[in-house]
A protein has these predicted regions:
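Core SAM-dependent methyltransferase catalytic element
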Residues: 32-46
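A charged, amphipathic interaction segment
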Residues: 141-206
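Histidine-anchored nucleotide/phosphate-binding helix
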Residues: 78-92, 96
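Amphipathic alpha-helical interaction surfaces in cytosolic regulatory modules
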Residues: 3-19
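A glycine-rich helix N-cap at a beta->alpha junction
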Residues: 19-25, 114-152, 156-159
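Short internal beta-strands
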Residues: 1, 94-100, 175-178
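Short, glycine-rich nucleotide/cofactor-binding loops
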Residues: 66-77, 151-155
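N-terminal beta-loop-helix "entrance" segment that forms/cooperates
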Residues: 7-10, 104-115
Length: 216
């Protein structure tokens, strides 16, 4: 397997299906894993596994919240982090899964990496980091964003960068979609500190344990 998000996905898959991850090794540009059916030294019956999953879900149902951040717009990004921080303040374990245009929110600016021609074209056309995000409405070639930030400053509204740091301080987990990163030519070195890379199985593993699941 060559997908970098596989390491988190396989762990989440084993946890949710009641199987055992015996080993996970990296070999140059690929990963090799060894799985064992069941947990530990004993195989788990389907009935026992179902009971375990139901119990785990019941125990954590009120504690988790997940957000899929698909949009790369400034206003939607701010709403995402406000909700995430609010949920964390209420005692929930919060996971934000950034995919496609949402990946621009968690990028660092001016990071030099080796890219193909198409990947370089994507980089040129996309915002460099969170400070360059457009508005979803009335952007007007960037003028709307400038005016919005001015109004926010005048009214003492926290900036997106502050909201992101506040969410990190509150323990919000941020995961970047490995498949979307590959499609859009974004490399792990370009992500801000503290962001993990994972796939859809990683997100679903978190989503099944929560009663708040949002798509923004």
């Amino acid at each position: 397997v060559t997908d970098p998000g596989f390491t988190k996905d396989i762990s989440s898959w084993c946890e949710k299906t009641g199987n055992t991850l015996v080993s996970l090794d990296r070999e140059e540009n690929s990963f090799r894993c060894l799985l064992k059916k069941g947990r530990g030294d004993e195989e788990v019956s389907k009935q026992d596994l179902q009971q375990d999953l139901q119990q785990a879900s019941s125990n954590s149902l009120q504690e988790n919240a997940t957000l899929v951040v698909f949009s790369g717009d400034l206003d939607k990004a701010m709403a995402s982090f406000i909700i995430a921080s609010g949920a964390a303040a209420m005692g929930k374990q919060v996971t934000m899964f950034f995919t496609f245009w949402g990946l621009n929110i968690i990028k660092k600016a001016n990071v030099k990496t080796e890219k193909s021609f198409m990947e370089k074209m994507f980089s040129v056309m996309m915002p460099k980091d969170a400070s360059k995000l457009p508005l979803s409405k009335m952007n007007m070639g960037g003028a709307g964003t400038v005016m919005m930030k001015k109004v926010m400053k005048d009214k003492n509204v926290d900036s997106l960068e502050y909201l992101m740091q506040n969410a990190k301080n509150a323990g919000v987990k941020m995961i970047a979609c490995a498949m979307s990163m590959d499609v859009m030519g974004i490399q792990e070195e370009e992500l801000i500190d503290g962001v993990e890379v994972g796939g859809v199985a990683t997100y679903l593993g978190e989503a099944t344990e929560g009663n708040v699941n949002l798509f923004i």
